[in-house]
Curated annotation (Swiss-Prot):
Biological role: Probably part of the ABC transporter complex MntABCD involved in manganese import. Probably responsible for the translocation of the substrate across the membrane.
Name the UniProt record assigns to this protein: Manganese transport system membrane protein MntD
Stated induction or repression of this protein's expression: Repressed by MntR in the presence of manganese.
Keywords recorded for this protein, A-Z: Cell membrane, Ion transport, Membrane, Transmembrane, Transmembrane helix, Transport
Superkingdom to which the source organism belongs: Bacteria
Gene giving rise to this polypeptide: mntD
Subcellular location: Cell membrane
Transmembrane spans: 7-27, 42-62, 63-83, 87-107, 138-158, 174-194, 203-223, 227-247, 253-273
Length: 295
């Protein structure tokens, strides 16, 4: 595959992976927790490096997953003690992220690990960091990492679809049915953490938030059924990555930024033209009804 194809494929994997797990966050009104975890995993990455002295992917995954779960646990703990959800997210988010930034500034100055790279990413460099198996170059490391995370997300969603669905729409009913709502919550937070850290090398922590929130939000405007919402969210995320790449090459701007911008374009289109909820669609429907009454 060409460098261009690897970049597009990696971006599509980011969009699809984030779109799937982001759907449940949007349904549970936890979109800002995605923003928090996407930043606090920096502490897990730095911590993994300080403990192991290695930038190997598996250690990053473990550190990020642990920090993501810690973030979710602390937010849940503060909320259970009477702190408002948004305030709890703000306290945990800023505290853990600040600790990560300080540790990175103090101990990570001499390694290929910096704040700007962690936050912004650079998908154009993805094809240069490849994986070799039995002497054969099989492609970019980021691509295969994201592919593995996507497979894991799809498997977990498929196996736990009923539990995820009930817990997202009616947690009290889920508890009454014996579904471990808290366990489901932490499974989803683990999925979010892994998806976020896998996306660091491509779109970065800041821009991955757009992929986690905007495609599911757009899909929610287009359908009320969870299965269709998952499919549409994944499609919008993947389509945004493709459009963003060509838009970026056309204007010679940041590829990651263009991909995130395209999610906004997709959301605006759904907001205006959604068959059931679109602003313009509703206006046209109202005008047609007025004409029918007048006629």
């Amino acid at each position: 595959m060409s460098f261009e194809a690897w970049i597009i494929a990696t971006g599509v994997l980011v969009g699809v992976s984030c779109g799937l797990i982001g759907t449940f966050l949007v349904l549970r009104s936890m979109a800002m927790l995605a923003d928090a975890i996407s930043h606090t995993v920096l502490l897990g990455i730095v911590g993994a490096f300080l403990v192991t002295g290695s930038l190997d992917g598996i250690y990053m995954f473990i550190g990020a997953a642990a920090t993501g779960l810690l973030t979710a646990f602390l937010v849940q703990l503060l909320h259970s003690k009477g702190v408002q959800s948004d305030a709890a997210i703000g306290v945990v988010f800023t505290s853990l992220f600040a600790i990560g930034v300080i540790l990175l500034s103090v101990y990570g100055a001499n390694v290929h690990l910096d704040i700007e790279h962690s936050l912004m990413g650079e998908i154009a460099f993805v094809p240069w960091n490849t994986v070799t198996v039995f002497g054969v170059d099989i492609g970019p490391k980021a691509f295969w990492m994201l592919a593995s995370v996507l497979v894991l997300n799809v498997v977990l969603i498929s196996v736990c679809y009923k539990e995820f669905k009930i817990a997202s729409f009616d947690p009290q009913m889920a508890l009454a049915l014996g579904i471990p709502v808290l366990l489901i919550h932490y499974v989803q937070m683990g999925m979010l953490s892994l998806t976020t850290v896998a996306s660091f090398d491509s779109v970065g922590a800041v821009l991955v938030v757009a992929m986690l929130i905007v495609p599911p939000a757009a899909a929610h405007l287009l359908t009320d059924r969870l299965l269709y919402m998952l499919i549409l969210s994944a499609l919008i995320g993947g389509l945004s990555a493709v459009m963003g790449y060509f838009f970026a090459t056309w204007l010679n701007v940041s590829i990651s930024g263009a991909m995130a911008a395209m999610t906004g374009v997709c959301y605006a289109s759904a907001f205006l033209f959604s068959p059931a909820n679109g602003v313009i669609t509703k206006k046209l429907r109202t005008l047609n009804m007025q004409k029918e009454r007048a006629g």
